[in-house]
């Protein structure tokens, strides 16, 4: 693992859930503006942040097994060097695992959905199925897939509340994503996040 960067916990701002739900859309076009570290922090916390001293997170997890790992390809975030980072929820920090950003490679592996390459960040949500299946057997696969859906919705809602756009991308070649990131977990979802073109 590379350098560790602590990222500030988000300030919780008042926003009506109903407003965010009404405004939530899938967005595939992003302008060239960078994200701020604060915005990155909010997105990661919403995805899988720790919410209390017992280790519970922002999403429900069968038996609190928390089988997911969140990686983020950083192309353009103010104050953060480009590269691929792993999110460490327990410390609300990111650790760089690749020195270069791989947005173009991710886009090609995702059936040439090139908007992925343009996004300032791309979340890669991957699963270590064994954390859940060793407790629940084959039913654990279902629970893992439910959990990634919870993460995706949280990212959608946080992005919307910040005036950003995102989309869930499930069309990609799994093994290519694993090879690009050099990870052992199984990728389930890509979520590019950026500023919407108005």
UniProtKB/Swiss-Prot annotation:
Keywords, alphabetical: Flavoprotein, FMN, Oxidoreductase
GO MF term set: oxidoreductase activity
Cofactor(s) for this UniProt protein: FMN
Listed CDD domains: McbC_SagB-like_oxidoreductase
Organism superkingdom: Archaea
SUPFAM superfamilies (alphabetical): FMN-dependent nitroreductase-like
Designated name of the protein: Putative nitroreductase MJ1384
Pfam family, one: Nitroreductase
Family: Belongs to the nitroreductase family.
EC numbers, comma separated: 1.-.-.-
Species for this entry: Methanocaldococcus jannaschii (strain ATCC 43067 / DSM 2661 / JAL-1 / JCM 10045 / NBRC 100440) (Methanococcus jannaschii)
């Amino acid at each position: 693992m590379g350098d560790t960067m602590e990222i500030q916990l988000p300030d919780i701002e008042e926003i009506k859930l109903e407003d965010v739900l009404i405004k939530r859309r899938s967005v595939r076009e992003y302008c060239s503006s960078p994200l701020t570290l604060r915005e990155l922090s909010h997105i990661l916390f919403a995805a899988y942040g720790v919410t209390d001293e017992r280790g519970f997170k922002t999403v429900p997890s069968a038996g609190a097994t928390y089988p997911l790992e969140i990686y983020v390809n950083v192309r353009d975030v103010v104050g953060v060097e480009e590269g691929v980072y792993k999110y460490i929820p327990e410390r609300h920090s990111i650790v760089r695992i690749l020195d270069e950003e791989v947005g173009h490679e991710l886009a090609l592996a995702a059936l040439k959905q090139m908007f992925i390459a343009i996004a300032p960040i791309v979340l890669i949500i991957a699963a270590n199925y064994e954390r859940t299946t060793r407790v629940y057997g084959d039913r654990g696969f279902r629970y893992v897939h439910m959990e990634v859906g919870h993460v995706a919705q949280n990212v959608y809602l946080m992005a919307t509340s910040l005036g950003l756009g995102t989309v869930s991308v499930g069309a990609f070649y799994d093994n290519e994503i694993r090879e690009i990131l050099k990870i052992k977990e199984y990728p389930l979802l890509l979520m590019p996040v950026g500023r919407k073109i108005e």
